[in-house]
Curated annotation (Swiss-Prot):
Protein name: Kunitz-type serine protease inhibitor PILP-1
Alphabetical keyword list: Disulfide bond, Protease inhibitor, Secreted, Serine protease inhibitor, Signal
Residues under site feature: Reactive bond for trypsin: K40, R41
Provenance organism: Bungarus multicinctus (Many-banded krait)
This protein's record includes keyword Disulfide bond: yes
Coiled-coil residues: none
Cystine bridges: C30-C80, C39-C63, C55-C76
Function, as annotated: Serine protease inhibitor that inhibits trypsin (Ki=55.62 nM).
Superkingdom field: Eukaryota
Signal peptide: 1-24
Family from the record: Belongs to the venom Kunitz-type family.
Record domain BPTI/Kunitz inhibitor: where: 30-80
């Protein structure tokens, strides 16, 4: 295979990788209900609500949780809103 063909193949693979949508495996914390169990502390956090297609605020109790909480609405939207 010539170097030009290899370069074209590399370019196409790079383009494919950039344009492929992110799967739900990469966003596990976006698809779960928020953990509202009370533990060591109560702080405001945000979770993604797929029905509302928005990040909503809730009281996070500080437990180990399920990974579905974000410190800010901006971070939540960045990771989950598609």
């Amino acid at each position: 295979m010539s170097s030009g063909s290899l370069l074209l193949l590399l370019g196409l693979l790079t383009l494919w990788a950039e344009l492929t949508p992110i799967s739900t495996k990469d966003r596990p914390s976006c698809d779960k209900a928020p953990d509202t169990e009370r533990c060591k502390r109560n702080v405001y956090a945000f979770y993604y609500n797929p029905s509302a297609r928005d990040c909503l605020q809730f009281v996070y109790g500080g437990c180990d949780g399920n990974g579905k909480h974000f410190r800010s609405k901006a971070l939540c939207l960045f990771h989950c809103h598609r």
